[in-house]
Amino acid sequence: MSENSNQNPSTDQDRREFLKALATVPVLGLFLVNLWQKLSRDKLKRANLLSDLVQEKKAPAVISGLSDSKHLNIGIIGYGGRGSHLVRGAGFATKGWTDATYENSKNNKLDKAFATFMSQEDLNCSLVGVCDLFDVRANQAIDASQNEVRPGGKPKKGAVRYRHYKELLANMNIDAVIVATPDHWHSRITIDAAKAGKHVYCEKGLTRTFDEALNVYDTVKRTGITLQLGHQNRQVEANEKAKQIIDQGLLGPINLIELTTNRNSPWGAWVWTIHPDGNSKTIDWDTFQEPSPNKIPFGEEALRRFFRWRCWYDYGTGLSGDLFSHDFDATNQIMDLGIPKYASSSGGIYFYKDGRDVPDVWHATLEYPEKDLTLLYSATLSSNDSRGNRIMGHDATMILGGQSNIGSVGGFIVTADQESTQYRERLESGVINTKYPIYTYSPGSKQIDGVTSATSQYFANKGLLYTYREGKRVDPSHLHVKDWLDSIRGGTQPKCNIEVAFQEAVTCAMATESYLTGRRVEWDPKNRRLI
């Protein structure tokens, strides 16, 4: 935010031209002059209010120049929708993807996916190892490793396919791995990778169960590898701005937080396409279901579960680990909440009667008695009426996305409370009006840059598809992978390190446990157990 000045040459020039135009309308002119002066005073008051209240910091710059740093060899384990996005974040996309997005950019000026990808920093790494249990995806990952259309030009080397992840981990030339498998494989692969000395980027949620989270945490701490959990929201500029606002006390004491999810499409409810080439010859089903508590033979049901795994607790964590985890981690980033004392949740399968066992309507309550705070989460997969997220304080409320109505992605507004103690004098004098925000953060344009599907728009509104640095549109997944690689090279901790990853994993496990058992769950930090 620029500093405000009482003297503005352009304003003075506008005023002179305005007054000159009113010279021939004496009666109305006097009224409008008074109105002009009042509006100018109000504008100045609001400007002074913001400079008085908000001590704003700039977002971190996009630091480039890794060409002289250590070259890293990475492997990908699980090249599905999320895995392919993370590999693009590292600088590797399939030829089919680059060809399609290039054509889309020519036909639609708002579609900036290709330009955003090509303007990424070259992260000075090579994709050298691929493991996926579906032949089609494994071949796509190899194609991505060899595609010359990428930031930095021709890749140094291509990838080799491994049938089992342990074979990939045995390659001593691989420095780090991205784990983007279904949730039920996260803990095994992460633990084995850490024991093999590989750094790990693990997609969220960290684990499927609470016990797995404990094992992953202990192994990462013991081995000393660098772990980044896949919450790219840690790179979203709006969250950093929101933290600044809250740390400065603009909201006053905060006692209630409301987080929401609204989707209304089969895709948004994880009813994903069953690939026509998926069969017993192209899919290693036995390996896929190896860690799951319940096993079934390969067939039509197995195909559904392989491609729509988030619909079953055998493989995923439902709304808790998939969607709530994003909003919780963002709020944890903003407010340093940590693990709640109590968690309770309820819901049901009310709309998608397709054999799934995870709910499509789900609510959770997290209680922080030591912080005098309760967090509520409400989700439905059968209504697209976006409600946004609210952080409610005694003096003001922050609304992020959804109902903030700021016309941009990843933004927020702060509106004063009528009964505020902090703003009482300003409210009484009219300097602050509860109908208007006292602070608005609105990055980028009012367009949803080429995003068309409801699910993509949901992620865009959460700031998970792109963010801004120095006015430049950047993929937060790219920034998150970069943060991980920079931390590996520098021996530092990434933004979503094992400590905050553990907080997310335990919190989501508590909420899931409450739903499955129908009881309130308590966290015992001293003994590291759920009661």
Q: What is the role of each PLM region?
A:
Residues 52-55, 240-241, 250-499, 503-517, ...:
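Contiguous beta-strand/loop segments that form the cofactor/metal-binding neighborhood of enzyme cores
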Residues 156, 180-184, 204-211, 230-233, ...:
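Alpha-helix capping and helix-loop boundary segments enriched in small/acidic/polar residues
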Residues 132, 180, 233-236, 475:
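Soluble non-cytosolic domains of exported or imported proteins
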Residues 2-14, 19-199, 214-226:
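N-terminal glycine-/serine-/threonine-rich beta1-alpha1-beta2 phosphate-ribose binding loop
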Residues 81, 85, 122, 136-140, ...:
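Extracytoplasmic/secreted proteins, especially bacterial periplasmic and envelope-associated proteins
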Residues 174-178, 194, 199-257, 262-266:
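Hydrophobic, small-residue-rich alpha-helical packing segments that form membrane-like cores
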Residues 74-77, 128-131, 178-179, 201-202, ...:
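Structural recognition of the beta-strand scaffold that forms the well-ordered cores
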Residues 19, 87, 91, 139-142, ...:
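Non-transmembrane alpha-helical segments in soluble domains
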